[in-house]
Regions:
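Short, low-complexity N-terminal intrinsically disordered segments enriched in polar/charged residues
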Residues: 26-94
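Bacterial N-terminal signal peptides
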Residues: 8-19
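A short gly/proline-enriched turn/hairpin at secondary-structure junctions
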Residues: 97-112, 129
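Positively charged n-region of N-terminal signal peptides that target proteins for export
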Residues: 1-4
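Surface-exposed, charged secondary-structure patches
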Residues: 28, 35-37, 42, 115-167
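A mature extracytoplasmic/lumenal domain signature
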Residues: 73, 92-95, 102-103, 143, ...
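Low-complexity, intrinsically disordered terminal/linker segments enriched in charged
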Residues: 34-55, 163-210
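Cleavable N-terminal signal peptides
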Residues: 7-8, 25
Length: 210
């Protein structure tokens, strides 16, 4: 159970990320929209309010990028919910890299490539019974320079996973990370994820410390 849980916790960092892109116009200035939420508790309605609150500080290109990247985040989320590995990774660039935060097992953090992510994510999906509608992955801030967008993401992930004996267990986790997305012939692709902050892990409603 512990090995399974650690895998699940690791894959949280990857996020069930995605979105859908078009748009050829990019801001040439490097401008960051400040996050408006500290400890995030952002549902569907709050997502709209968050984006609206940021709109005044964003250029038209940044607003378009925000919408398109969020849509791709949502599409990869739906792939995860459907246990479709290809869909869950569809908008990851070939050179995608995940940088995890330091922990007791990895004092300097880990650097994980797309091929390794595919292995971890398959294990995660194989152990997944269901994903709760409470799960939400939202952009909190965005900046652009040329065809590169840097976004801060917060994910609240609620799912039911299979224990070692096949029994179901509810897991609640949250993570905040910085992502870079690059605009290509395929639209926006997720190039890197840097873990910034991990929230508490709850297993069947109780704190869990791996």
């Amino acid at each position: 159970m512990k090995e399974l849980f650690l895998t699940t916790a690791l894959l949280l960092v990857v996020g069930i990320a995605g979105g859908m892109g078009l748009g050829d116009v990019f801001a040439q200035t490097e401008k960051t929209s400040p996050p408006t939420m500290g400890a995030r508790d952002c549902g569907g309605a709050d997502r709209g309010r968050l984006a609206q609150a940021q709109e005044a500080s964003l250029s038209p290109a940044e607003r378009m990028a925000w919408q398109e990247i969020q849509e791709r985040i949502d599409r990869m989320s739906h792939g995860e919910e459907a246990k479709d590995l290809n869909a869950a990774m569809h908008f990851m660039a070939d050179n995608y890299t995940l940088y995890t935060s330091p922990d007791k097992d990895s004092p300097n953090g880990k650097v994980i490539n797309k091929q390794q992510i595919a292995v971890y994510k398959k294990q995660n999906l194989d152990s997944l019974y269901s994903t709760s509608p409470e799960t939400q992955t939202d952009i909190e801030s965005l900046s652009m320079k040329g065809n590169i967008a840097t976004v801060t993401i917060h994910q609240h992930y609620v799912r039911v996973i299979r224990g070692g004996d096949g029994s179901p267990h509810e897991v609640r986790t949250s993570v905040r990370h910085r992502e870079t997305w690059i605009y290509t012939e395929r639209g926006w692709l997720q190039r890197s994820v840097q873990e910034l902050e991990r929230g508490p892990i709850l297993l069947d409603g109780q704190p869990y410390h791996p």
